[in-house]
Design a protein with these regions (language model features):
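Detector for C-terminal structural segments
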Residues: 5-19, 38-155
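A local structural motif
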Residues: 18-33, 90
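Short, well-ordered beta-strand elements
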Residues: 1-5, 28-31, 48
Length: 155
């Protein structure tokens, strides 16, 4: 299991290795690499299993589902499925939100069935926000708050 250097990644790799050993009887070799080496290994496909993460750049299913298209540079699993690619292309060309949602649902069903990836956890950030601070974007997928959007109300 290849992972990049960070204490949180090491903990996750150890937890996965222990779980796979207990539940599957699998012997897992952990490989820790510094960021540049890790990126080289990831890009060249020199791994059997890799710990990776992704954060959406924008609030749309394509920000995640597009990663597994055959031609996407972020497709570390080297997943290739013509039906999946066709659904992504149709969704990209559709202007109808309901149709796009249906197409993305179908694409996601293919990912779930073929399992080229195994989502394990999701990063979270806790916030304590005073009730008189308004404009904080609670559902922002980038987890970014711009001061120009924030304002105070009388309390």
């Amino acid at each position: 299991l290849l992972y990049n250097t960070a204490e949180v990644h090491k903990k996750m790799a150890l937890a996965i290795a222990n779980l796979w050993k207990q539940k599957l009887g699998a012997r897992v070799e952990l490989t820790n690499q510094e960021w540049k080496t890790y990126l080289d290994s990831r890009q060249s496909g020199q791994f059997e299993v890799i710990r990776s993460s992704w954060v959406a750049d924008y609030n749309d299913p394509s920000a995640f589902l597009g990663l597994w298209g055959s031609g996407h540079s972020g497709n570390m699993a080297r997943f290739a499925n013509p039906a999946y690619d066709k659904l992504l292309a149709q969704a990209a060309n559709s202007q109808d939100p309901a149709e796009r949602a249906r197409l993305f649902d179908e694409a996601e069903a293919i990912l779930q069935k073929e399992a080229p990836i195994a989502p394990i956890y999701q990063y979270t950030n806790a916030r304590l926000i005073k009730p008189w601070l308004k404009g904080y974007p609670i559902n922002n997928p980038e987890d970014v708050a711009y001061s120009r959007q924030l304002y105070l109300v009388k309390h």
